[in-house]
Amino acid sequence: MITRNSIILRRLYPTAIIRTLATDATESTVVKTKRRRTIFTDELNKGPSFDDFVSGKAKDMLEDPLETARKDPNAKLPSWLKVPIPKGKSFHNVKKDVRELKLATVCEEAKCPNIGECWGGKKSEATATIMLLGDTCTRGCRFCSVKTNRKPAAPDPMEPENTAEAISRWGLGYVVLTTVDRDDLVDGGARHLAETVQKIKQKAPQILVEVLGGDFRGDLSMVEILANSGLDVYAHNLETVEALTPHIRDRRATYRQSLAVLERAKQTNSSLITKTSLMLGFGETDDQVKQTLRDLREIGCDVVTFGQYMRPTKRHMKVVEYIKPEKFDYWRDTALDMGFLYVASGPLVRSSYKAGEAFIENVLKKRKHNVGETPRLAQEIKPSIY
């Protein structure tokens, strides 16, 4: 606001002098305060000085974070989660064919710790898990390391043929076909999966085929298409207990929807083996796991596997607890007592881990010898899974 005094000052004194007087008056009234100390400042003060760097003493004062983590026992994985580096002729042959035929495998994309054991086994025991419909998922679950995108590339029309060719070439006894979720496709990729199964059976009818499929956004007619494709095992993973599902899986995947998928598969083709997998270590309780097993038995699910959740990267959710091997034994015995046809349970067990062994040594032997009490059979043939 312009006052009479300010007009008089402007007439008597030049503008520069007025600005100087105003600045001096302001500075005289400002009380200078010390800058607040910060954690960063404190850390700098604790560290080496410029003279320490010049004299070479700094290297003795600084800690290498990688070396510190290596020496810290709490930063290490438990001994039961360590695996040898993948190697061997069979392993490299499978890897070579995967590259040549431009196939994607969940073994590599999901950084599975069992890749060396599954790919490196004998032909009759080896298991490969081929990931169809590309390597990019339309969903983003907090535990999964597979790439995500709302609009992945269109499916390769030659993928069913190339997959069947590769599998027949390897001479595997069992193959697992899995897939990324393709919510961008009208049928969710169900017909693409069914075609792949049919081509495999045409080229190598002796191979047992398991398909680990998605929920097709709850469209159960797509489940029926896949269940009637000629596959031997229909798998769909619950991943975790009901209470934790919204926090761990993509919001489009629900616990009840997954149960409905497994139930419809069995209703469509009663000869199918239905299978699911649970990861432990998210903070689930024993009561929650037991309720999940009861829910699975109510819909007639035949096979369940338990494995330890292992954080793929720092961008994914943290591990709440590393479950001990003894606890996995407990869950195996508990599930068998509830009537599951077969249970694989161990820290390194994954949905498709030793799938061929599980199916061949349990289901086929049961059918061949007409064994009545399945849980007892499964207990007698407990494989070494860790």
From Swiss-Prot:
[4Fe-4S] cluster 2 binds at residues 137, 141, 144. Pathway: Protein modification; protein lipoylation via endogenous pathway; protein N(6)-(lipoyl)lysine from octanoyl-[acyl-carrier-protein]: step 2/2. Its cofactor is [4Fe-4S] cluster. It catalyses: [[Fe-S] cluster scaffold protein carrying a second [4Fe-4S](2+) cluster] + N(6)-octanoyl-L-lysyl-[protein] + 2 oxidized [2Fe-2S]-[ferredoxin] + 2 S-adenosyl-L-methionine + 4 H(+) = [[Fe-S] cluster scaffold protein] + N(6)-[(R)-dihydrolipoyl]-L-lysyl-[protein] + 4 Fe(3+) + 2 hydrogen sulfide + 2 5'-deoxyadenosine + 2 L-methionine + 2 reduced [2Fe-2S]-[ferredoxin]. GO terms for cellular component: mitochondrion. Binds 2 [4Fe-4S] clusters per subunit. One cluster is coordinated with 3 cysteines and an exchangeable S-adenosyl-L-methionine. Residues 122-341 form the Radical SAM core domain. It is an enzyme of class 2 (transferase). Gene3D superfamilies: Aldolase class I. InterPro entries: Aldolase_TIM, Elp3/MiaA/NifB-like_rSAM, LIAS_N, Lipoyl_synth, rSAM. One of its GO terms (molecular function) is 4 iron, 4 sulfur cluster binding. It is found in: Mitochondrion. Keywords: 4Fe-4S, Iron, Iron-sulfur, Metal-binding, Mitochondrion, S-adenosyl-L-methionine, Transferase. The keyword Methyltransferase does not apply. SUPFAM superfamilies: Radical SAM enzymes. Its EC number is 2.8.1.8. [4Fe-4S] cluster 1 binds at residues 107, 112, 118, 352. The keyword Nucleotide-binding does not apply. This protein may be expected to contain an N-terminal transit peptide but none has been predicted. Belongs to the radical SAM superfamily. Lipoyl synthase family. This is Lipoyl synthase, mitochondrial. It comes from Candida dubliniensis (strain CD36 / ATCC MYA-646 / CBS 7987 / NCPF 3949 / NRRL Y-17841).
